[in-house]
Amino acid sequence: MTLQQLDYIIALDKTRHFVRAAELCGITQPTLSAMIQKLEDELDCKIFDRSRQPIEPTEIGRKIIRQAQVIHYHTNQLHETVQSEKNTLSGTLNLAIIPTIAPYLLPSFIASFRKLYPNIVLKVSELHTTTIIDKLRVAEIDMAILSTPLEDPKILEVPLYYEKFMAYISPNEAIYDRLELSASDMPLDDLWVLEEGHCLRNQVFNFCSEKTHQSSTYEAGSIDTLIKIVDINGGYTIIPELHIELLNEKQKLNLRNIVNPEATREISVVIRHDFVREGVLNAVANCVKKIIPSQMLDPRLKKFAIKL
């Protein structure tokens, strides 16, 4: 068994296609097939079910691939430990970010990070929280930026900033004339929310925890869609503070502060406990903090944070 063979089964699991996996690994398809077959013979089990199209891992194959991913991660960590001792920031960084942060953070972050750390190859994926946690556990990604706390003992959270929620209300709503709103002012019957899988959806419902959860006519896939729905259909939605910069001047008139209590979410960079690239972690954290308004870095806002 070699590290190369483990890389091959990881690639095949990712692509579910022998030719594409071979291209990903930079070898010929017959070589890839032969090396995977050799590994299966050595382990005396089938890692992939070749009768299916596209091919799929067998039940034991999934377990082997998960272990291969962890071994691959720790091998990279070994190289990174050496680089850390040399005080050089290089290599590849696989970073994930949730969709309700990405639109306003990513454009500036990517530009700034590439300029400051040209020797790091940055790969960014936009994923939901549950997918991020799964990928972090098996070391498919190195770190992520998302809403916390996760309360997962295997994941280390490093808080970056605290973001308030705002109510975005149609001018046709009875509550539109109020300058501030509390949870009791906002009827769930008129609330538009994100679809299942978004942590922001859970936070909105937790904020309105004293009310009965309703079945929305439509659950949107993005905050932009929610805003357009409110503009045309009425009702209201809840949006993160940083999304305000993406609104036009007319839309900004529809915003209201939420009080008693304030609604805030904690945004953190999260890593596995065995992550050794401290320099890269600090690079990401510092880069984000340079983008975020200074008042959102105040840790005293944590007391208003809503649980997921």
Sequence positions of predicted segments:
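Hydrophobic hinge/microswitch elements
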Residues: 128-141, 146-147, 197-256, 301, ...
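Short helix-boundary/capping micro-motifs
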Residues: 10-28, 52
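Secondary-structure junction motif
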Residues: 176-177, 189-211, 277-286, 291-305
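A late-sequence structural motif
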Residues: 105, 171, 254-297
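Central regulatory/effector-binding core of bacterial HTH transcription factors
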Residues: 90-153, 220-222
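Residues within helix-turn-helix
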Residues: 18-23, 30, 37, 133, ...
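Flexible hinge/capping segments at coil-to-helix
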Residues: 152-191
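A short LG(V/I)-centered, amphipathic sequence patch enriched
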Residues: 40-59
